[in-house]
């Protein structure tokens, strides 16, 4: 790798100094870098080999969604709290990371993403892509949602809950975990359906093959009360007769790993920080 695009979350402490250090480490090794705060616009930089984010998991997830259609791999420097997805912590390992990237000694994990399409009046209205999860949740009115879930056209269940999470394996350690869902090995090809605070003890998470197509419709008729949210920061309002279709996306996120490590080791290390 030679050309890098650096993305920093300006709200995190120490980002500017870390960006300066990272740019210096790349330049002294003969690399080229561009940098930005916030969302990525790579149309003017078609030759970028790698995107490096400085922030938390949220910064990496937003960047991964921005570039997933371009096939550019991404790596994150954790400047936040847990950092499940970022590869190094703080700025102390920047030199080590740059050496590995410049010398092409890394490897890439391809993570599946979910395509969430709102179907309105029989037509595709809006499609969002999620690396972690797609969530159907209530909005202004704090009332229970009643959602009908279908798998490959077959009725699964009517969930009475605060919402429904459809998660990727990558997202299994995020909102899904907080809602009582299982942890799934991140390189697997699965989708998880997890109700949020269900009003029945029998309503629990279900794990599906990523080849399945999920449709969710609504039994209630609460006006302007629900929305589809992906990865916690992109959303679309849902109407009573809308149907949400969820399937494995044709695109994926390529996460760079500096060394091969156990998924379980990573989970243990992160859990100990909570």
State what each model feature region is.
Residues 158-161, 166-202:
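Gly/Ser/Thr-rich active-site loops/lids in small-molecule metabolic enzymes
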Residues 110-114, 130-132, 143-147, 162-164, ...:
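A generic structural signal for short beta-strands and their flanking turns/coil linkers
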Residues 1-50, 54, 90-107, 117-128:
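ATP/NTP phosphate-donor binding region
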């Amino acid at each position: 790798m030679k050309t890098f695009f650096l993305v920093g979350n300006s709200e995190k402490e120490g980002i500017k100094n870390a960006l300066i250090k990272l740019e210096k480490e790349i330049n002294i090794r003969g690399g080229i870098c561009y940098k930005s705060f916030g969302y990525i616009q790579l149309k003017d930089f078609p030759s970028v080999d790698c995107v490096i984010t400085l922030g938390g998991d949220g910064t990496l997830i937003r960047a991964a969604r921005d570039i997933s259609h371009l096939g550019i791999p991404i790596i994150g420097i954790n400047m936040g709290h847990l950092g499940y997805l970022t590869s190094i912590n703080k700025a102390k390992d920047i030199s080590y990371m740059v050496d590995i990237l410049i010398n092409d000694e890394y490897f890439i994990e391809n993570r599946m993403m979910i395509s969430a399409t709102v179907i309105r009046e029989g037509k595709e209205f809006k499609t969002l892509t999620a690396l972690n999860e797609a969530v159907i949740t209530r909005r202004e009115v704090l009332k229970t949602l009643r959602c009908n879930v279908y798998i490959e056209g077959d009725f699964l269940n009517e969930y009475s809950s605060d919402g429904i999470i459809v998660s990727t394996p990558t997202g299994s350690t995020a909102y899904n975990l907080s809602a009582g869902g299982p942890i799934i090995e991140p390189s697997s090809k699965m989708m998880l359906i997890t109700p949020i605070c269900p009003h029945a003890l029998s309503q629990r998470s279900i794990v599906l093959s990523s080849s399945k197509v999920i449709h969710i419709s609504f039994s209630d008729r609460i006006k302007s009360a629900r929305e589809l949210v992906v990865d916690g920061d992109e959303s679309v309002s849902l109407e009573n007769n809308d149907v949400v279709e969820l399937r494995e996306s044709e695109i994926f996120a390529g996460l760079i790993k500096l060394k091969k490590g156990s998924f379980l080791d990573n989970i243990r290390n992160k859990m100990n920080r909570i």
